[in-house]
């Protein structure tokens, strides 16, 4: 977590990173800096962490700070100490350098316990390589390697341990100071590569629309249509929806895809039901699909139903308003009742399932929410 006091003219406010675009905009509005471009503001104070005091009394790019905040928020174990000690060792004091450092911590092993040669060797190699066999912790090769490390004199004593620089591990500059490298910070459905004029950005949907705006601006693209999109990953375990999402991206664009991704991005979203509802409603575009997803509870989904007899049985068993007394159940005409349900609630068989809407919200109201309704012939 990073907290800065940012200043614009005579106004200043606190802002914590990482933050959402909405939170950043709210902070900018508080100091009347919402129209400042590029988004570089003066840092009057680094509230925390103290180790980033190099950012104080200078102008910084808030999007860079936010990206760094996300990277630091993902640090695990002693990685934050590694980061600070490597930063001091290298003399890094710019945001591009700090962002790149966050991707290169494997170059800087930090050994906190130097009393056990085996642990020294193993921790060093684990940092550099990322993984080691779990069943050879007692292998003497680690102690031999640890002893050579200590005898080399290359370790630098720091506040948090003995810092080494692995010369065989190159320092890779993923961030060029303009376009952010790929980094998945939060759970997402769609991971896309956006390219224009030799530059690359990455989109993680669903996201705030302004995040897409900023990515395209960093690319220098005149319009969204000028950006070439390709898929890195899609986290939807449903082949039909995977193909539908790709079609929407190609035919309608990333903003429409983002709205749909936001609508379906919930742990309890039943994609099979949504697919059936979309067929039932004959949804034409991403906007209508998103509205159906937001109103999915308006629809009753009878999975695997092919006959009205099944509908009658389902409704009488699952809707207390239509419960049938067991003493007369054998005389009840479930098929006729199922047909009645289909008629009054506009039910339809679709793809081996049955969909109906027994709420006060009509299908037309759902499909055309926020759209002007027109009357034919006028």
Language-model-detected regions and their locations in the chain:
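Residue-level signal for functionally critical sites in structured catalytic/ligand-binding pockets
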Residues: 7-9, 114, 143, 159-160, ...
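Amphipathic alpha-helical packing elements
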Residues: 14, 130-150, 321-342, 347
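Generic structural motif recognizing short loop/turn segments at the entrances and edges of beta-strands
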Residues: 1-2, 11-13, 37-42, 138, ...
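Long, highly charged low-complexity segments enriched in Glu/Asp and Lys/Arg with interspersed Ser/Thr
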Residues: 147-181, 339-371
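Short, extreme N-terminal segment that most often corresponds to the first beta-strand
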Residues: 1-26, 182-209, 356, 373-377
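Mixed-charge (acidic/basic) macromolecular-recognition segments
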Residues: 28-139, 161-186, 206-330, 365-368
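Non-Sec secretion/translocation targeting segments of pathogen effectors
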Residues: 141, 333, 367-378
